[in-house]
Amino acid sequence: MAKNVTGRITQIMGPVVDVQFEGELPYILNALETRVGDRRLVLEVAQEIGERTVRCIAMDSTDGLARGDEVRDTGEAIAVPVGPETLGRILNVIGEPIDERGPIPTTRTAPIHRQAPSFDEQATSAEILVTGIKVVDLLAPYLKGGKIGLFGGAGVGKTVLIQELINNIAKGHGGVSVFAGVGERTREGNDLYHEMIDAGVIKLGEGTTEGSKVALVYGQMNEPPGARMRVGLSGLTMAEYFRDEEGQDVLFFVDNIFRFTQAGAEVSALLGRIPSAVGYQPTLATDMGALQERITSTKKGSITSVQAIYVPADDLTDPAPATSFSHLDATTTLNRAIAEKGIYPAVDPLDSTSRALDPRIVGEEHYNVAREVQRILQSYKSLQDIIAILGMDELSEDDKLTVARARKIERFLSQPFHVAEVFTGSPGIFVPVEDTVRSFKAICAGEYDHLPEAAFYMVGTIEDAVKKAESLNATA
């Protein structure tokens, strides 16, 4: 493919730009470059529409672009800088730094489009990733090198949970992390950057970020759909370099996968494709598969990914979240009804799943305690209609005991977060998985039936609940 072939813009429709070439046509997914004033604008070829014209998607605003402007074909896909030099920096979808700390000092780049690792290159592990969050570690544990989805509607705590996971896992994790901000709030991206600096995960020296452990790639809500659709791939390309070339175990955080799908739907409509169910692009499953299949662990290294996934109108059967489900090893589902009770994290203990909850992986004791906790909560759920109509007095003694324990378990699944300390005033708690299993085993066995419900709310281990009960009695 010849580089530096030039064409001219014939039509601009918002983020969609048509470019006509006299000579060779660029390939689909090639990056084209043009100048708008003093800035570089990258276009990605999406379609060939005849008459030597290609239809492209802009990766930035097309304000100031005019018909007749010259466009150069780079001869390759969008390429972003990769390697240790990206750590401690904030980049955009095309790999340009946006943190006002000068250019990235590397000539190493990698194209954002590539094949997923082949079947024989892939590797799986059966090692648990401890998060320090009780409800996750007990009922839907995460696997090292696995894919984790945090599902939830608007305002139930996905971003807070992903930030707590960054706090608990990334800070104690020896390797590197990559965070892709896909179509979310710029303010949250800014807060995360400063939190990472405060925590020492990003080290800012005089003109250097040496010693940093995380690279940030942002394509936020105000960006055009092309940028939001591709920024996840840009972040993933950086994570793949650390996995493949340096053999590292990488943590890859994405907030939010739904915005990737949403941007794909916008682009699809702009390109004139006939939409499928609920207005999504007809290629929804293909687009999701192209991204998700690359997020995997190989014999060289691993990528453990944590993805926040917005659920439109709290409907888990919506095509966007439903398409994500099949790619994940563990799902943590956040429930508005639990958030309304003031129980945070608002994780639904009966709706969250993990393929790691297996006695061969977590051990017999952990598995049995988790299943007993779910059995008690399920019994309570099925009794709620009877309680609502007839009241607690009509229940048998056994059922009353089940309800009392379930309410204590529900409250004990709450936990103060480190990242929410400034709002709650309660110091965050990291609970080791052994303490979590031991505490819930004792509650299920009835050893703490005498403690009041309030003692179990927003504490760490069972010992903290006992102390809280004593202080409640003292003030009563």
Swiss-Prot record:
<dbReference type="Pfam" id="PF22919">
    <property type="entry name" value="ATP-synt_VA_C"/>
</dbReference>
<feature type="binding site">
    <location>
        <begin position="152"/>
        <end position="159"/>
    </location>
    <ligand>
        <name>ATP</name>
    </ligand>
</feature>
<dbReference type="GO" id="GO:0005886">
    <property type="term" value="C:plasma membrane"/>
</dbReference>
<dbReference type="InterPro" id="IPR000194">
    <property type="entry name" value="ATPase_F1/V1/A1_a/bsu_nucl-bd"/>
</dbReference>
<keyword id="KW-0547">Nucleotide-binding</keyword>
<dbReference type="Pfam" id="PF02874">
    <property type="entry name" value="ATP-synt_ab_N"/>
</dbReference>
<keyword id="KW-0406">Ion transport</keyword>
<keyword id="KW-0067">ATP-binding</keyword>
<dbReference type="InterPro" id="IPR003593">
    <property type="entry name" value="AAA+_ATPase"/>
</dbReference>
<comment type="similarity">
    <text>Belongs to the ATPase alpha/beta chains family.</text>
</comment>
<keyword id="KW-1278">Translocase</keyword>
<keyword id="KW-0813">Transport</keyword>
<protein>
    <recommendedName>
        <fullName>ATP synthase subunit beta</fullName>
        <ecNumber>7.1.2.2</ecNumber>
    </recommendedName>
</protein>
<dbReference type="InterPro" id="IPR004100">
    <property type="entry name" value="ATPase_F1/V1/A1_a/bsu_N"/>
</dbReference>
<dbReference type="InterPro" id="IPR036121">
    <property type="entry name" value="ATPase_F1/V1/A1_a/bsu_N_sf"/>
</dbReference>
<dbReference type="GO" id="GO:0046933">
    <property type="term" value="F:proton-transporting ATP synthase activity, rotational mechanism"/>
</dbReference>
<comment type="function">
    <text>Produces ATP from ADP in the presence of a proton gradient across the membrane. The catalytic sites are hosted primarily by the beta subunits.</text>
</comment>
<dbReference type="InterPro" id="IPR050053">
    <property type="entry name" value="ATPase_alpha/beta_chains"/>
</dbReference>
<dbReference type="InterPro" id="IPR027417">
    <property type="entry name" value="P-loop_NTPase"/>
</dbReference>
<keyword id="KW-0066">ATP synthesis</keyword>
<dbReference type="InterPro" id="IPR005722">
    <property type="entry name" value="ATP_synth_F1_bsu"/>
</dbReference>
<keyword id="KW-1003">Cell membrane</keyword>
<keyword id="KW-0375">Hydrogen ion transport</keyword>
<dbReference type="InterPro" id="IPR055190">
    <property type="entry name" value="ATP-synt_VA_C"/>
</dbReference>
<keyword id="KW-0997">Cell inner membrane</keyword>
<keyword id="KW-0139">CF(1)</keyword>
<dbReference type="GO" id="GO:0005524">
    <property type="term" value="F:ATP binding"/>
</dbReference>
<dbReference type="Pfam" id="PF00006">
    <property type="entry name" value="ATP-synt_ab"/>
</dbReference>
<comment type="subunit">
    <text>F-type ATPases have 2 components, CF(1) - the catalytic core - and CF(0) - the membrane proton channel. CF(1) has five subunits: alpha(3), beta(3), gamma(1), delta(1), epsilon(1). CF(0) has three main subunits: a(1), b(2) and c(9-12). The alpha and beta chains form an alternating ring which encloses part of the gamma chain. CF(1) is attached to CF(0) by a central stalk formed by the gamma and epsilon chains, while a peripheral stalk is formed by the delta and b chains.</text>
</comment>
<dbReference type="GO" id="GO:0045259">
    <property type="term" value="C:proton-transporting ATP synthase complex"/>
</dbReference>
<dbReference type="InterPro" id="IPR020003">
    <property type="entry name" value="ATPase_a/bsu_AS"/>
</dbReference>
<dbReference type="GO" id="GO:0016887">
    <property type="term" value="F:ATP hydrolysis activity"/>
</dbReference>
<dbReference type="InterPro" id="IPR024034">
    <property type="entry name" value="ATPase_F1/V1_b/a_C"/>
</dbReference>
<keyword id="KW-0472">Membrane</keyword>
